[in-house]
Amino acid sequence: MPPEPAYSFTIPSVEDDTTLECRIYHPAGLGKTLLHHNTNSLRGAIFAHPYAPLGGSYDDPVVLPVAAMLVETGYVVGTFNFRGAGGSHGKTSWTGKGEVEDYCSVVGVVMHYLRTLQHSARQGSELLSPVMSADERNVSGAKGSHGERPLSILLGGYSYGSLVLARLPPIQAMQQRFEEATMGTAAAEIVQRARTLAKQTLKAVEDERQHDLKASRERGAIPEDAPSSPVRHGRTFPVLIGGEETDSADRRRSRDTPRSMDLVRKSVDFPKRLKAHMRHGSALQEGHPLSEGDKCHPPTGIGGGGDGSSPLLVNAHYLLVSPVLLPLTTNIAPPGPPAPQLGLRGRSADSKAGALFLQHATLAIFGTNDTFTSNRRLRAWATKTEREAARNFEWQAVEGAGHFWREEGAVQKLRERVTKWVETLR
């Protein structure tokens, strides 16, 4: 039985403001984590569904158990419907470019949701109003501290979702995009939505704590000044949130803004910028100073530290379930350079589209009876990638499992292997 989502809500895609359906799931111990200010244990995950025209959605029978497993292991999990899937607006694109941007949009909302939870807990659980002040729109909410662990984000996808995953830019590039968001744009709206959700969570945790404290005092079980831990008291899930955070007078559609054209240009230029972004990410994570050429411009929008606060440090990990390697899938594959990490033809000697899987902890898992890609080709790709990635890449071929994991015991084996890998990321 999959868990109930804490929130079901919508966000605009940073591609063209297409409305996307999203869910956020909470692990059981989230309230306790926030009350005890143990925010170093906060982890986020996003998992993408299969091809929408073939029935893919966030209710997919593989997506749901994988999401449930991640929740059980302590992740705050985000799932979503790509454009054209479920209740999301728009249509599935022929190039996949829109789906890549849809995924980036969900990365933004999950990342800033966790960022707000982190900051508020570190400030002594001083809960903020769900309505943003004007000052808060213009400053960052996360001030770094020495010894602060990077936020762990797991990015995953199943089948077509893994193809989209393979075309994502580095996590630091996505992070910068939201930190520099201009008020009224889709990216800014996503940051606002993330903060509103986080503040609602913090308020719910505090309300439950006060409820427990009052009930215990009335029973005489504890003294007046004793602490209490939160438990759920009949709260109905999920909380449904739609509409927009930004005042309609301030809201600017991405397709109407000069910035949207700049973002398209950046997407086209991504292969040339990949190495620079990876150097930037490595320097941030390892504490190395950046060269002048690698430094990002100071954020000026609502999402990041234009007030002098330190940037949010993020570590990315990747999970590919039943990756699709057949050349026949190029018609539905996302845009960009050929994906050598997925074994597609036309590999360029200079193409590094698979570098993210080589540089970050990655697990690929597939069945030996996959009908979309032969077991021989999957094993050859996985073996080669493992060799190139040294210790960062792991893979598992589940005997007898097909692409849809419908065989007896197949989903359980999938869950067990992913759980084992996730435990190594702590």
What do these predicted ranges mean?
Residues M1-G44:
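N-terminal cap/lid segment of alpha/beta-hydrolase-fold proteins
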Residues L54, G90, A401-K413:
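Catalytic histidine-centered segment of alpha/beta-hydrolase-like enzymes
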Residues G55-P65, N375-R376:
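The serine-hydrolase catalytic nucleophile loop
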Residues P65-H89:
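Conserved alpha/beta-hydrolase
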Residues A85, W395-F404:
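Histidine-bearing beta->alpha loop at or near hydrolase active sites
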Residues T92-G144, Q172-A221, V231, R235-G243, ...:
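Alpha/beta-hydrolase active-site loop
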Residues L155-L165:
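Gly/Ala-rich beta-loop-alpha elbow adjacent to hydrolase catalytic centers
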Residues L358, A364-F366, D370:
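Short beta-strand/loop motif that positions the catalytic acidic residue
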